[in-house]
């Protein structure tokens, strides 16, 4: 029997190579595991760090602003001016037109295009914060907020219709608007003008646009004769609900945008609307355009009114990095600067920066006085609690709303 042959073994050098190879693999695996993102929060932080590094190298940062269309012309101009600056050239701003409430719902759904929410007013803010906590919990979704510009609510009417309306009812109020909407004979009964048809009033969709919500709140405040502490009892009052339901069933349009509603009135003339309830700023922006098409407009301020502050909310959302929040803050500082605030006056806003005056030669509030503009207002109402707003919107949807 032949002796068994002995297999060659590893030399010392070979064993050393194998040991070093295995050790290297183990270290690499450990390193990868240690740096692997383990949650959405870790991924967001990594994205923020990457964005910070990019910004420090002078690379571009991109942010999206969901805004109410009442600010469209002013914001578009401001974005163009901001892009001329050194810091502005590194920040790309995407303007995303949305109804105020529509923008809030988009953020709640996780629309990652949006890093700033700029509705027409703060009316819906508490509702938004409550819904965010329910859906996401954790930190508050707003890291910085400022008011850009102020604008009260107004009723805008064609001058000829306004004259006939006041001759019949004595004043323009939610009570007299309700009476006109209830006239089955329309303008024949109001002013002996059958060719004018029914009385046509428009406001925006209250579940999508802030001005529609503001209109409902002013109706409630006016009905109950108060300016603060609107309560659930007030909203659930059968008398109010019956009156408001009759009013709302006569409304001609439920646009999701205040700017679009005013534009439609000016484009189509009295055949579309005799009157609309909009922001003062939107009315001012269209006063001269309307005059050249269908005649003059008249602006009427409700006895009880609401401020629309056009807030600018920098969002603390999971998809918004620290650098994007800083970029949003830089644009906010730019919007609040005096030259940009002065330009807001051109578009009918009352500047949010108190250093910028409203009354001066050439101001729209001086130039357009004959249309009914007035710097001094009557009683201003306060925003009710979130539960009141929620119940008012739910009542409206069940009673007269459309999906």
What do these predicted ranges mean?
Residues 160-167, 208, 224-230, 318-328:
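Short helix-loop capping/hinge motifs at secondary-structure junctions, enriched
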Residues 2-17, 21-32, 37-42, 56-58, ...:
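Extracellular/periplasmic juxtamembrane helices and adjacent flexible linkers that interface
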Residues 142-155, 240-256, 291-320, 324-325:
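Periplasmic-binding protein-like
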Residues 192-224:
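Extracytoplasmic/periplasmic solute-binding protein
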Residues 214-300:
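Ligand-binding pocket segment of bilobal, Venus flytrap-like solute-binding proteins
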Residues 82-86, 111, 118-121, 132, ...:
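Sec/Tat-exported extracytoplasmic proteins
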Residues 72-79, 101-104, 122-125, 129, ...:
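Extracytoplasmic/secreted envelope proteins and their assembly/folding machinery
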Residues 2, 6-11, 15, 36-197, ...:
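N-terminal segment of the mature folded domain
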């Amino acid at each position: 029997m032949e002796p068994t042959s002995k297999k060659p073994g590893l030399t010392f050098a070979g064993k050393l190579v194998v040991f070093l190879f295995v050790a290297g693999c183990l270290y690499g695996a450990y390193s990868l595991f240690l740096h692997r993102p383990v949650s959405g929060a870790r991924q967001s932080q990594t994205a923020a760090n990457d964005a910070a590094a990019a910004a420090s190298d002078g690379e571009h940062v991109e942010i999206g602003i969901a805004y109410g269309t009442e600010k469209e012309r002013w914001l578009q101009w401001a974005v163009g001016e901001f892009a001329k600056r050194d810091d502005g050239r590194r920040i790309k701003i995407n303007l995303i037109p949305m109804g105020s409430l529509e923008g809030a719902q988009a953020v709640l759904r996780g629309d990652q295009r949006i890093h700033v929410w700029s509705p027409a007013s703060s009316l819906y803010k508490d509702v938004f914060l409550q819904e965010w906590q329910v859906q996401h919990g954790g930190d508050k979704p707003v890291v910085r907020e400022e008011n850009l510009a102020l604008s009260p609510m107004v009723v805008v009417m064609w001058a000829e219709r306004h004259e006939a309306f006041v001759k019949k009812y004595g004043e323009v109020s939610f009570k007299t608007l309700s009476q006109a909407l209830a006239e089955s004979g329309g303008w024949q009964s109001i002013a002996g003008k059958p060719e004018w048809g029914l009385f046509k009033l428009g406001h925006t969709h209250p579940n999508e646009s802030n001005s529609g919500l503001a209109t409902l709140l002013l109706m409630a405040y006016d009905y109950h004769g108060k300016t603060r502490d609107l309560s659930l009892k007030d909203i659930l009052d059968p008398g109010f609900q019956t009156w408001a339901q009759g009013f709302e069933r006569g409304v001609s349009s439920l646009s999701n945008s205040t700017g679009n509603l005013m534009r439609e009135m000016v484009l189509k003339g009295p055949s579309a609307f005799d009157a609309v309830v909009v922001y003062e700023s939107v009315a001012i922006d269209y006063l001269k355009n309307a005059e050249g098409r269908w005649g003059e407009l008249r602006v009427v301020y409700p006895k009880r009114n609401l401020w629309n502050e056009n807030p600018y909310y920098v969002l603390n959302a999971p998809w918004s990095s620290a650098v994007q929040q800083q970029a949003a803050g830089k644009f906010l500082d730019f919007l609040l600067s005096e030259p940009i605030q002065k330009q807001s006056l051109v578009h009918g806003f009352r500047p949010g920066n108190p250093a910028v005056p409203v009354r001066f030669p050439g101001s729209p509030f001086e130039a357009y006085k004959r249309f009914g503009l007035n710097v001094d207002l009557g009683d201003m109402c306060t925003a009710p609690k979130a539960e009141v707003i929620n119940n008012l919107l739910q009542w409206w949807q069940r009673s007269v709303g459309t999906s």
